[in-house]
């Protein structure tokens, strides 16, 4: 990829396939690092099949019992009134669309359900609850979702329907029988609960129940078919199936193909040009805020370029980045391209990339440095670099903390997205030392019983580990400023994170600040921040091409 005077080589590694299981806090942001397209971004014809989406599709008219449909829509009207919800015409249209897919007598591809891919912040949860209530089924409904959203869904269901769902999670799993689950109106569970572990290969009680409806919220968790989660989801028995995600394509076209498999659409359909058109037009509901006329306060994005304050800090980062050779420098002279420096990666490239990111925020340990020294990476003694790290005075952390403290009295709640536990701890301590004491950390260390309390309370600053709290949370009431300490490999994760604030109910302009380190040596050696941005843009190209027809 050409970017200014540099040409970057983006290495194609699908880390979800290499390491499909949970990864440590030290490297959890790496799981979505590449996941590039199957065919490679350099192929001239990589998007040929996507271009065909622009053509008109011929789809048979669905056969729907209009009397049954209107009866269901009357149920929806009662639901809105009884739940004391604000009527929104686009949500009614969405519920009507969902019910028509469930009750049609000739569903395309034999799919009774579909993919709800409305833009983040439009209220997909309420839409789905409305559909569940409006078209009651004899068998129970199973909702599969990230563990962080269990309580939010349970509260929303009880608030709007007066019925408490059964939460199949934790100790509750031991109390269940097939009969007890079958007698529930709605059951909530997690993606890990439906997973079929490869070593055991055994199904669990959830796979024995005949579900009337299965709903996968944040369905992009199913994008990797090599995982036990995907296998377990595919094994569930159901009449209707719904996928809910505002980001159905995160890294590559195969993300969308795998969601089609969950809908049980044959590969012979979704991998053909005409089939892709028909799928998009018949089983996918995708609407943006602009399309439905929803006007929210603006999102103002600011990139904060951070200069290196310490030569020793910069030297440490340069040593590690030099070992990666992340760039191909190209120099043009007399219209002739000269030698392109070839990038060479060591066998532990993924760990090295993680270390390069950590070097920008001072999170390297003595063990990390000793390993790097053994590999011949460091130009100075470990002791000298440890002195730098122990000072906890790194340029990027300073920039983030100073920016937040400068705005501490402006009346806007602040969300700071981090990658590492230690990073969150340092930022919180520095903010407290600077007089901002009403701060809290939301990450995997926080007990589930405490998470609801943290989210309901208003804090001056909420520090969130991005993989823990980037999706599903409603934070628009208390927060309108977002700080990304570093870019994430997956741009959809950042989009989801911004949508925690920029959604229905937000009354303030949402300011987003992205912190990026300056390059290391006369702009010849890019930092990981710059490199991640290149990877992000390649992934956004895929998403834009797939959504072009929308």
Regions found by a protein language model. Give the residues of each.
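Inter-lobe coupling linker of SF2 helicases/translocases
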Residues: 188-189, 193, 203-208, 228-238, ...
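A conserved SF2-helicase RecA2
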Residues: 489-498, 502-550
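Conserved pre-motif I regulatory segment
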Residues: 68-115
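Walker A/P-loop NTP-binding motif
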Residues: 99-103, 125-139
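Conserved Helicase C-terminal RecA-like lobe
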Residues: 68, 109-113, 119, 127, ...
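SF2 helicase motor core recognition
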Residues: 197, 251-252, 424-426, 451, ...
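Conserved Walker A/P-loop ATP-binding site and its immediately adjacent core
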Residues: 138-159, 420
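Conserved helicase ATPase motor motifs in RecA-like P-loop NTPase domains
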Residues: 120, 239-252
């Amino acid at each position: 990829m050409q970017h200014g005077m540099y040409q970057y080589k983006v290495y194609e590694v699908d880390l979800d396939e290499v390491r499909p299981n949970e990864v440590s806090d030290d490297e959890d942001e790496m799981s979505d690092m590449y996941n590039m397209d199957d065919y490679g971004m350099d192929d001239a014809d990589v998007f040929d099949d996507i271009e065909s989406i622009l053509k008109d599709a011929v789809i048979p008219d669905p056969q729907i019992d209009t009397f049954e449909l209107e009866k269901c829509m009357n149920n929806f009207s009662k639901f809105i009134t009884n739940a004391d919800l604000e009527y929104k015409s686009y949500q009614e249209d969405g519920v009507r669309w969902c019910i028509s897919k469930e009750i049609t007598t000739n569903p395309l591809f034999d799919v009774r359900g579909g993919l709800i891919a409305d833009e983040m912040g439009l209220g997909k949860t309420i839409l789905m609850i409305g559909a569940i209530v409006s078209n009651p089924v004899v068998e129970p409904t199973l909702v599969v979702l990230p563990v962080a959203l269990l309580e939010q869904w349970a509260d929303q269901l009880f608030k709007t329907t007066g019925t408490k769902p059964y939460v199949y999670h934790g100790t509750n799993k031991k109390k269940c029988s097939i009969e007890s689950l079958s007698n529930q109106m709605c059951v909530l569970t997690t993606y890990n609960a439906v997973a079929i572990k490869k070593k055991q290969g055994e199904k669990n009680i959830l796979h024995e129940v005949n579900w009337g409806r299965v709903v996968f919220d944040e369905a992009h968790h199913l994008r990797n078919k090599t995982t036990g989660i995907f296998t377990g989801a595919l094994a569930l028995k159901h009449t209707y199936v719904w996928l809910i995600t505002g980001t159905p394509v995160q890294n590559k076209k195969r993300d969308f193909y795998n969601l089609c498999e969950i809908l049980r659409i044959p590969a012979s359909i979704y991998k053909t040009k005409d089939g892709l058109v028909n799928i998009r037009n018949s089983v996918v509901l995708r609407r943006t805020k602009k399309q439905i006329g929803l006007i929210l306060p603006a999102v103002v994005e600011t990139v904060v370029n951070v200069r290196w304050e310490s030569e020793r800090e910069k030297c440490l980062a340069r040593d590690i980045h030099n070992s990666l050779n992340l760039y191909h420098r190209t120099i043009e002279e007399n219209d002739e391209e000269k030698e392109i420096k070839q990038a060479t990666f060591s066998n532990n490239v993924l760990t090295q990339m993680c270390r390069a990111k950590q070097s920008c925020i001072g999170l390297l340990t003595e063990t990390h440095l000793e390993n790097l020294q053994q590999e011949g990476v460091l130009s100075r003694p470990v002791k000298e670099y440890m002195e730098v790290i122990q000072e906890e005075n790194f340029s990027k952390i300073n920039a983030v903390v100073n920016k937040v403290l400068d705005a501490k009295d402006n009346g806007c709640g602040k969300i700071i997205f981090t990658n590492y536990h230690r990073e969150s701890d340092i930022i919180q301590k520095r903010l407290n030392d600077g007089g901002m004491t009403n701060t809290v950390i939301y990450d995997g260390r926080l007990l589930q019983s405490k998470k609801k309390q943290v989210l309901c309370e208003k804090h001056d600053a909420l520090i969130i580990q991005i993989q823990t709290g980037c999706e599903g949370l409603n934070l628009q009431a208390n927060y309108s400023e977002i700080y990304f300490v570093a870019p994430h490999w997956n741009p959809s994760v950042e989009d989801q994170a911004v949508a925690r604030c920029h959604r229905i109910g937000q009354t303030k302009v949402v300011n987003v600040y992205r912190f990026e380190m300056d390059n290391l040596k006369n702009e010849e050696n890019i930092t990981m921040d710059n490199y991640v941005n290149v990877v992000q843009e390649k992934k956004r190209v895929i998403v834009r091409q797939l959504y072009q027809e929308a």
